[in-house]
């Protein structure tokens, strides 16, 4: 076992704080409409330019083990916020840094870290309640576009594209973002279906960089039971091979010998194939397989219908223009099912939604309806160079996630104003002075976003915060894009409540843990073995020692 280095108390916390500062300082320059870019060097290809906080955070690894611990904890804040809300990573990082800094000062001044943590938790719960009371539900396409525009750093076209996509496929519909072959960004809505089952073996992958399997003009075999061997399937497999087209198998499971045979055939190049598990369980799985069959114009191979695998012919297989399979999801695009059949199935599901009394069943039926009726919207991101396209794609991904979050929980005034206002409305009291200090730490941290946005815009942060808090109006704030003060919601500067709430809760959670850390353990760096004596130089003979 390698030797360890241990740091205690203040020494350890200061090292950790340095790591927090390094990561947060690199991330927070991207905050706000006038946030700057960060360039990330890549070991292959051109450097990447981004304004996406989590992309910056993920690239940071520090040499000093103790500093790196602090940096990685804050990176966790950004990643977790991104996973839950899909945006707000820079917000979470700025808040975490502010809480850790203030908390560290309080601990150094002799306050009890556990009481500080309790105070922080009390204040955060109070702020979340205040934000939820202030949140405004969004319903119109214009409001959706506003949220998208803000999250895409003021790019109005992105906001409009997202609003249009959501209008066409519904709030629950599937929207994907791809790189375009042209310089223009365009929106395309294609009928299709996505379900949460990925490929059964990574050997089916056709695009190793993105780890996805793309099949074009594909046959789809829908089987209700498990497939353990392929003997009974040989006639249909041979028929598919002769067409030269790929095959997707959707079954309860494909296991053992059957999966191994498919993988070997795929690797040898004899058969373009992929296999996924059927979505859902029990009766719901049967219904979803029927949905896929109707969408693709195929037949479910089911013993209930008296159809056996040996008797399957090509015309019983579904067809689709494209199937895209990732580790977690399968998307079937442009199935060749008859429009009248799809409309009939949609009407049937709508009738079931009306009749059901179970909330769970209703939710699942609505999911199926969205998959059948909504289709898939594809935003194709264009640009002059590959670097520009990747940067724009990052922003559109953020904007899409923020918009979905806004539809779920509503919106609050943007530009850090909602949190700054909440700092003046914390009414909860701590049980002692140290808890009260924890509450005040959150109070000060909540103003850090407005400060950072103003700093990035080249304005005097203290003056901006003072002016904003002087006026006792919930929506009054500072528009860094135009350097004007006014009603943030009227100016279209809004943030999704889910993003703001998640960022604050995650930042406070990790910051509290850092404040209450008393010992840190890391491996000692390995010492290099001393270099050996140089060998004698050939051809010169030995040297006489005098």
UniProtKB/Swiss-Prot annotation:
GO terms for molecular function: ATP binding; ATP-dependent protein folding chaperone; isomerase activity; unfolded protein binding. GO terms for cellular component: cytoplasm. Its EC number is 5.6.1.7. GO terms for biological process: protein refolding. It catalyses: ATP + H2O + a folded polypeptide = ADP + phosphate + an unfolded polypeptide. Gene3D superfamilies: GroEL, GroEL-like equatorial domain, TCP-1-like chaperonin intermediate domain. InterPro entries: Chaperonin_Cpn60_CS, Cpn60/GroEL, Cpn60/GroEL/TCP-1, GroEL-like_apical_dom_sf, GROEL-like_equatorial_sf, TCP-1-like_intermed_sf. PROSITE patterns: CHAPERONINS_CPN60 (PS00296). NCBIfam families: GroEL, PRK00013.1, PRK12849.1, PRK12850.1, PRK12851.1. This is Chaperonin GroEL. It comes from Rhizobium leguminosarum bv. viciae.
């Amino acid at each position: 076992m390698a030797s360890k280095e241990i740091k205690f108390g203040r020494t350890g916390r200061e090292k950790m704080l340095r790591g927090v500062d390094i990561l947060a300082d690199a991330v927070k320059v991207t905050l706000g409409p006038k946030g700057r870019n960060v360039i990330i060097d890549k070991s292959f290809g051109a450097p990447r330019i981004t304004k996406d906080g989590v992309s910056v955070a993920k690239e940071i690894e520090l040499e000093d083990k103790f500093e790196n611990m602090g940096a990685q904890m804050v990176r966790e804040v950004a990643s977790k916020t991104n996973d839950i809300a899909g945006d707000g990573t820079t917000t979470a990082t700025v808040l975490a840094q502010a809480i850790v800094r203030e908390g560290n000062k309080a601990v150094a001044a002799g306050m009890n870290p556990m009481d500080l943590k309790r105070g922080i938790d009390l204040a955060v719960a109070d702020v979340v309640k205040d934000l939820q009371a202030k949140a405004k539900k969004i319903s119109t396409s214009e409001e959706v576009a506003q949220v998208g525009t803000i999250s895409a750093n003021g790019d109005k076209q992105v906001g409009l594209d997202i609003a249009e996509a959501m209008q066409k496929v519904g709030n629950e519909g599937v929207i994907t973002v791809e790189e375009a072959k042209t310089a223009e960004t365009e929106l395309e809505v294609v009928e299709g279906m996505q379900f949460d089952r990925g490929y059964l073996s990574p050997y089916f992958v056709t695009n190793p960089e993105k780890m996805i399997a793309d099949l074009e003009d594909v046959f789809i075999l829908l089987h209700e039971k498990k497939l353990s061997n392929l003997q009974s399937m040989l006639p249909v497999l041979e028929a598919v091979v002769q067409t030269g087209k790929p095959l997707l198998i959707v079954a309860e499971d494909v296991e053992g010998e059957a999966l191994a045979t498919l993988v070997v055939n795929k690797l040898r190049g004899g058969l373009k194939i992929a296999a996924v598990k059927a979505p859902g369980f029990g009766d719901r799985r049967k219904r979803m397989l029927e949905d896929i069959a109707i969408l693709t114009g195929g037949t479910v191979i089911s013993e209930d219908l008296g159809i056996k695998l040996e008797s399957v012919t090509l015309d019983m297989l579904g067809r689709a223009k494209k199937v895209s399979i990732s580790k977690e999801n399968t998307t079937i695009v442009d199935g060749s099912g008859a429009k009248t059949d799809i409309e009939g199935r949609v009407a049937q599901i709508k009738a079931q939604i009306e009749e059901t009394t179970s909330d769970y069943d209703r939710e699942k039926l609505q999911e199926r309806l969205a998959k059948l009726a909504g289709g898939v919207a594809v935003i194709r991101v264009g640009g002059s160079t590959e670097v520009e396209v990747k940067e724009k794609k990052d922003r559109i991904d953020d904007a899409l996630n923020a918009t979905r979050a806004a539809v779920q929980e509503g919106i609050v005034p943007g530009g850090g104003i909602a949190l700054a206002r909440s700092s003046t409305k914390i009414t909860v009291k701590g049980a002692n002075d140290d808890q009260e200090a924890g509450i005040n730490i959150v109070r000060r941290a909540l103003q850090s976003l407005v400060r950072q946005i103003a700093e990035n815009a080249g304005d005097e942060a203290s003056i901006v915060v003072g002016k904003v808090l002087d006026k006792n109006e919930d929506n009054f704030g500072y528009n860094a894009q135009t350097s004007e003060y006014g009603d943030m919601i009227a100016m279209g500067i809004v943030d999704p409540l889910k993003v703001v709430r998640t960022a604050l809760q995650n930042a406070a959670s990790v910051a509290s843990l850092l404040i209450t850390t008393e010992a840190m353990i890391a491996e000692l760096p390995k010492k290099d073995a001393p270099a050996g004596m140089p060998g004698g130089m050939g051809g010169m003979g030995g040297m006489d020692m005098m």
